[in-house]
Amino acid sequence: MDKSLLLELPILLCCFRALSGSLSMRNDAVNEIVAVKNNFPVIEIVQCRMCHLQFPGEKCSRGRGICTATTEEACMVGRMFKRDGNPWLTFMGCLKNCADVKGIRWSVYLVNFRCCRSHDLCNEDL
């Protein structure tokens, strides 16, 4: 395992946040839970599964828990693959301005992000 790449993972997430589009501004944001209260639409909060490090075939090894996504956030699953397509690492949690993205190149890895707001712990199903 390349520890220097693991230490750079937060930098990758920060760069991704700066480049991604906002979930709430997307035209196809159909997974948001919207309730109408007193004739005003209200976006409900969503709880997300959180895990900072999970390797293939193993349980979550760091950062297991639940986070609460604000109206600007979504539940997210990030998966890193080696260039040959073999899975290397999975991480999940709440992410601001989340967007579904495939194939971001990061060193010798490819990274995919999937986002949801359809129900509590929806990122367990992605």
Swiss-Prot record:
Signal peptide limits: 1-21
GO molecular function, one term: acetylcholine receptor regulator activity
Keywords: Disulfide bond, Secreted, Signal
InterPro entries found in the cross-reference section: LY6_UPA_recep-like
Any one GO CC term of the record: extracellular region
Free-text tissue specificity from the UniProt record: Expressed specifically in prostate cancer, normal prostate, and testis. Expressed in the epithelial cells of the prostate cancer and normal prostate tissues.
Chief location bin: secreted
Domain (UPAR/Ly6) ranges: 46-125
Localization (cell): Secreted
CDD domains: TFP_LU_ECD_PATE1
Disulphide bridges, residue numbers: C48-C75, C51-C60, C67-C94, C98-C115
Family per record: Belongs to the PATE family.
Name the UniProt record assigns to this protein: Prostate and testis expressed protein 1
Species assigned in the record: Homo sapiens (Human)
Taxonomy of the source species: Eukaryota, Metazoa, Chordata, Craniata, Vertebrata
